[in-house]
Swiss-Prot record:
GO biological process: chemotaxis
Organism, as annotated: Methanocaldococcus jannaschii (strain ATCC 43067 / DSM 2661 / JAL-1 / JCM 10045 / NBRC 100440)
Pfam families linked to this entry: CheF-arch (PF04283)
Name of this chain's protein: Uncharacterized protein MJ1615
Length: 255
């Protein structure tokens, strides 16, 4: 029996299991779906099957659903105005995509975003990175700093209401002192460049921000390709940087 006390998040709505075989079927049907997230695994409970994989088997989040799935939903009047996806590596089914959507679009995309915030926390928190902060274009002589991704609380005032948001940042530990780099706000451009990282030429994220009216260029490196992809997906899905730099082409170009 699953220990519900260790649940991190739960999504209740409808979903569809997408594999090369299911795409061959003339009709693809959405059905009731529960997605339960734990610290170390994610469970998809369909009507007639349950799929459980470790979080390390999550390959992608937020990839576009196949056109056939979208077209069939439209033709059958299935309300998937707001939807998302998770690609997993399953022993039983291989690499599969799980599309999911709220039962109704009346609540907007909030049910999806609320779940994905928790999922991205699990996928990104404490992941090791290297950073060149405010390095400018000529950064050859700047030294990489070792750090990790983390989430910090930020109080946001909205009228009379104060909301608490968790913001993704890079934390550096220098002689037991913590240093925070907020590189995921006020973003003007995001590109992928090749730079020297510890003697090897590696792909890194080049992030251009505007702070106090000035342009700041920073470089972020992670040796884990999936972590890099999750960072980009996070910026598109939850920070809404859909039309900036490489993020405009994310569906097509990011491995």
């Amino acid at each position: 029996m699953i220990d519900k006390s260790s649940e991190i998040a739960r999504f209740s709505g409808k979903g569809i299991l997408i594999t090369p075989k299911t795409l061959e079927k003339p009709l693809l049907k959405w059905e009731k779906l529960e997605i339960i997230l734990y610290k170390d695994k994610i469970v998809f409970e369909f009507v007639d099957k349950t799929i459980e994989v470790g979080v390390e088997d999550i390959e992608d989040v937020g990839a576009e659903l196949p056109k056939k799935v979208i077209d069939i939903a439209k033709s059958t009047l299935e309300d998937i105005t707001y939807h998302s996806s998770i690609i997993i590596k399953s022993k039983e089914f291989g690499n599969v995509m799980v599309g999911f959507a709220p039962e109704t679009s009346i609540y907007g995309k909030a049910p999806i975003d609320n779940f994905l915030r928790k999922l991205f926390y699990i996928l990104l928190n404490k992941k090791e990175v290297k950073i060149l902060y405010n390095a400018g274009e000529n950064s050859e002589n700047t030294k990489w700093e070792n750090g990790f991704l983390t989430f910090i609380k930020k109080r946001i005032k909205d009228g009379l209401v104060t909301k608490i948001e968790y913001r993704l940042v890079v934390e550096i530990l220098d002689n037991e002192d913590s240093k925070i780099y907020d590189i995921f706000s006020n973003i003007k451009d995001v590109e992928i460049e090749e730079k020297d990282v510890d003697g090897e030429i590696e792909p890194v994220l080049k992030i251009l921000q505007v702070k106090d009216g000035k342009d700041i260029i920073s470089y972020l490196y992670t040796k884990d390709k999936k972590v890099r992809l999750f960072i980009l997906r996070y910026m598109v899905i939850l920070l809404d940087y859909k039309y900036i730099g490489i993020l405009r082409y994310l569906q097509e170009t990011v491995e």
